[in-house]
Amino acid sequence: MTAALSRICSLTPRSLAAGLRISLLIAAFTASSTCGALIYETTSPYHHIRVVDDHGIRTLYFDNAAESSMSLSNNAGGHFEYTEYFHMPWLWNTQICEVLMIGLGGGSTQHAFEHYYPDVSFRTIEIDPAVARVARDYFTVRESDKQKVEISDGRVFLRRSRAKYDLIILDAYLSGRYGSSIPQHLATKEFFELARDHLTANGVLVYNVAGTVSGWHSDIVGAMYRTLGVVFPQVYLFPVTTSMNVVLLATCSPVRANLDGVRWRAAQMTQARRITIPGFRQRVEAFRSAAPANASRCPILTDDFAPVEGLSGGYGNPDRTRSP
């Protein structure tokens, strides 16, 4: 915060006003993260972790960023809206049986898949043992025949595994000097090639990116879109309407989708009760097939060059709105 204020001192009056508004927003985000009753707190090699209860909602914080939330009365509710876009792959692959997720957090997605798709096998890779303990002790995450949690780095796991998945979900962030950002080694062309090799013929990969299509942190969204496009035949975007997140969806299928087709599939799947998550057809309206306007000038991220933290700037604590 001190560095931010010192930069503001050198700005013009108009820029100063804008900078002060940004500083006030940052302060508001930080203040909001301390509301409610602190239930648990610890520090791991990766995060300062807190669990906070407020008005029937339990929220997991990494540093000052709200990472996951859960209704205390229904562990499949109270989640952030962006996680609902992790259900979109069913519109491209109606036979999802095996799912791999990198990043556990408070287990919002794990709870949702367990609730809505009880026959799906779901394996989660989480690098931080402290996060896995918190998810178990405070967010009711339980292992079963269909739900498995393994402590490992996601890329290392894929390199050592021979398993194939119908869906791979990525929602992993690390804390850095400027806030939280996507782990560099999970954002490169080489990583996506590795992930693609672990997908089935009609497999789908989805990736939560903290940013917007145009404006706040749009460069990291553009770079991720462009990098995925080097590896996968088709890439789509779902900008989240209530928070600063974009969910990218990449398919192994070369068939290009459009909004009308996606709407039709969503109608078929919901009418057949294959998808019963509330508001699913409304979420479909966020679908975008066009590349972000800035994508062509954003870098293709590689193991040799992946300035992820610089492109995203560290997201701090963006405003994420819960879904019922």
Q: Which residues does each PLM region occupy?
A:
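Soluble small-group transferase modules, centered on the S-adenosyl donor enzyme superfamily
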Residues: C35-T59, D63-S68, Y236-P324
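Acidic/histidine-rich, surface-exposed loop or edge segments in extracytoplasmic proteins
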Residues: D63-S71, L205-N208
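N-terminal secretory signal peptides that target proteins for export/translocation
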Residues: M1-S15
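Sec-dependent signal peptide recognition
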Residues: R7, A17-L25
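The AdoMet/dcAdoMet-binding core of the Class I SAM-like
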Residues: G77-Y207, S214-M224, V231
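Histidine- and/or cysteine-centered catalytic micro-motif in compact active-site loops
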Residues: Y173, A210-T212, V240, S253
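N-terminal signal peptide c-region/cleavage motif recognized by signal peptidases
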Residues: A31-S32
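Extended Gly/Ser/Thr-rich low-complexity repeat segments
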Residues: L72-A76
